[in-house]
Amino acid sequence: MKNIAKKDLFINNEIRVREVRLIGLDGEQLGIKPLAQAQAIADDANVDLVLIQPQATPPVARIMDYGKFKFEYQKKQKEQRKKQSVVTIKEVRLSPVIDKGDFETKLRNGRKFLEKGNKVKVSIRFKGRMITHKEIGAKVLADFAEATQDIAIIEQRAKMDGRQMFMQLAPIPDKK
């Protein structure tokens, strides 16, 4: 009953089977009953008869307050959506020959992303003959990682991919 959507449930007069395995209000088994008798029991208790497992033989029906059940189900779904956190990866692009002022600006942007709880992909694109000096790019990435070590951990070390070197930083869990 945990992942039941409205389209899966048949209620009261929507049920089109001859007999059902009936479950009472408190979850007790009431046995196999003809549909008319099961609906009469539900009507006497002023609640709904809900078909919860139509594929079973015989189908399983439960006596419950459907409005309350639906409300509780929606409430649980809402809570689960609240608990989900969407982790986005923001990218900061650098150059191997980046100037100090530009580096500070990119660093400030990267820190903002990390403080908001986002992961940051720091990438360096090598153009032309710069690719022969990969150590310069590695130093720039190391400087970036060192400058953010108080709020971030290195999730993926510096790595080459074609003409691009990148690393990924994640915020320290308790600093979110």
UniProtKB/Swiss-Prot annotation:
Pfam families: IF3_C, IF3_N. GO terms for biological process: ribosome disassembly. Transmembrane segments: none annotated. GO terms for molecular function: ribosome binding; translation initiation factor activity. Its main location: cytoplasm. It comes from the Bacteria. GO terms for cellular component: cytosol; membrane. The keyword Ion transport does not apply. InterPro entries: T_IF-3_C_sf, T_IF-3_N_sf, Translation_initiation_fac3_CS, Translation_initiation_fac_3, Translation_initiation_fac_3_C, Translation_initiation_fac_3_N. It is found in: Cytoplasm. Keywords: Cytoplasm, Initiation factor, Protein biosynthesis. Belongs to the IF-3 family. IF-3 binds to the 30S ribosomal subunit and shifts the equilibrium between 70S ribosomes and their 50S and 30S subunits in favor of the free subunits, thus enhancing the availability of 30S subunits on which protein synthesis initiation begins. Monomer. This is Translation initiation factor IF-3. It comes from Streptococcus mutans serotype c (strain ATCC 700610 / UA159).
